[in-house]
Amino acid sequence: NVVEAFSGIGSQAKALKKLGIDYKVVNILEWDISAFVAYDFIHNGAPDITPYKNFTKLELLERLVPLNLSSDGKNPISRIALKAWSVEALRIIWAAYNRTRNLGDIQKVDYLTFPSNVDVLTYSFPCQDLSIGGAWHNNHSGIDRDANNRSGLLWEVERILESIQMNGKELPRFLLMENVSNILSKRHASNFNDWKNQLERLGYYNKVYTLDASNFGSPQRRVRTFMVSVLLPNNDIQTFVEQYFKDNDLEEIAKKKPKKLERFLRMDYSNPIYKEEANISNPNDTPSRRKIYEGNDILNK
């Protein structure tokens, strides 16, 4: 049983499926409308709005507005903004919210709404306030507890876990964190250590990895930091867990040869359809992207 917090489009579920693991996503936590609608398409297919075909716009708004959803992943969408959307779009949103069993805004979740018997809780919390890219825009707030920013939503996971424990419910057996490797930098290390200490206090054993996607067959170099947290019922289990991680160190595994880019991208631009798709996918011309381009020797060849 898996719960995906900050689920986005469901990359964790996709990985479990690819690995052939028997799993069930019992809930997701995602307030970004585009993200959970995409999640529904990717994992469940075309939206089924049949149960809601007779819902009026007013009925849909009465259900959607209290959920505190977002259209940009940054700020809550207002009732006025939601009302401007077509009734068909609102039906798709409501259908996706229900079919993904979405608990919505993580700030509204507690031990009462969090499911029981959870094996794995994943939490790829927002990276904008931790990333080097954010630092370029003078954003250094990171995961400070009082930052009141997107990356600081990490501490909502702490709140939920504490409320579960204090009210006698079972904690998830495993936690899986993923974020940018800058979380280990001098600026953010003390906060990250605080988080690890809090998890240990709750009874978890933590193992941190920094891994490059290119070492696992991906056609790109993407370094990310992961933390696996294992709930320990007793000290004997801790000895076993420590030995397991020692024997199965992901940072020491044999590196796989990256797959060729052509396997993932349609690069035959003599095909007018592929060329048009490539043109549409070009990133917007912004000052920050120009700065990146001009400072990259490979792109500027």
Region annotations inferred by a language model:
Residues 1-171, 181-193, 200:
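Core alpha/beta nucleotide-donor-binding catalytic domains of modification enzymes
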Residues 1-26, 36, 66-76, 85, ...:
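S-adenosyl-L-methionine-dependent DNA methyltransferase catalytic core
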Residues 43, 218-221:
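A short catalytic or substrate-binding loop motif that flags glycine-/basic-rich loops and adjacent residues
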Residues 108-111, 213-218:
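A short acidic, often aromatic-flanked loop/helix-cap motif at beta-alpha or helix-coil junctions
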Residues 122, 208-210, 226-228:
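Conserved hydrophobic/aromatic beta-strand scaffold that supports enzyme active sites
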Residues 181, 203-215:
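Conserved S-adenosyl-L-methionine
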Residues 186, 209, 238-239:
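Intrinsically disordered, low-complexity regions enriched in proline, serine, glycine
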